[in-house]
């Protein structure tokens, strides 16, 4: 049986539409979560336990902003937020050749992401990545922390670095804005 070449797969497979969240605290740092490993070997291989911002798929008929709010809550329990900005463009990333046809359930060539920046207005006790939504949602992270925005590309899995660099560029002015109200 002959398998499709990576080039053929890229031509055939679409991008998955996703929403991403850069959640800033009043000190201008961004919330990142460490990908939980072990539940799914494919996911473990795909992500390699890096840190990343909350993100997830946009459901059919769902607005990207609504998806961003939903994904943030489903992954962190956070709902105390104010919208600060929306990235001006969709951000794309492609899966590496060796993951095409298997990662993202084999249905996508990568992701097309719409990014939103929010200010966290709650108390840190609201953040719960281990039992998000009071345990209603599967934990995608096993830890979280606040991090400098410009450091994010070095903390993410290699094939998403350019996408994260685009997000950092889009939101570069926000840390200063939120620090000074």
Q: What is each PLM-predicted segment?
A:
Residues 1-27, 105-106:
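Acidic, metal-coordinating catalytic segment for phosphate/diphosphate chemistry
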Residues 57-158:
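Unchanged
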Residues 149-181:
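Charged phosphate-binding loop/patch that engages nucleotide di/tri-phosphates or the phosphate backbone
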Residues 15, 64, 160, 164:
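Hydrophobic (often cysteine-bearing) scaffold residues that line and stabilize catalytic clefts
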Residues 39, 44-52:
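Short glycine/proline- and charge-enriched loop/turn segments
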């Amino acid at each position: 049986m002959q398998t499709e070449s990576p080039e053929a797969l890229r031509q055939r497979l679409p991008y998955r539409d996703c929403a991403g969240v850069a959640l800033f605290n009043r000190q201008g740092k961004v919330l990142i979560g460490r990908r939980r490993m072990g539940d799914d070997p494919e996911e473990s291989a795909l992500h390699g336990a890096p840190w990343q911002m909350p993100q997830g798929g946009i459901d059919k008929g769902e607005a990207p902003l609504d998806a961003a709010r939903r994904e943030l809550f489903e992954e962190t329990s956070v709902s105390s937020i104010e919208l600060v900005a929306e990235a001006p463009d969709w951000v794309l990333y492609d899966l590496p050749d060796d993951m095409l046809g298997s990662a993202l359930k084999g249905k996508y060539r990568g992701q097309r992401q719409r990014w939103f920046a929010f200010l966290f207005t709650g108390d840190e006790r609201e953040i719960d990545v281990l039992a998000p939504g009071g345990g209603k949602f599967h934990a995608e992270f096993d830890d979280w922390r606040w991090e400098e925005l410009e450091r994010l590309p070095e903390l993410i899995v290699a094939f998403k670095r350019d996408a994260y660099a685009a997000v950092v560029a889009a939101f570069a002015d926000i840390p200063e804005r939120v620090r000074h109200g």
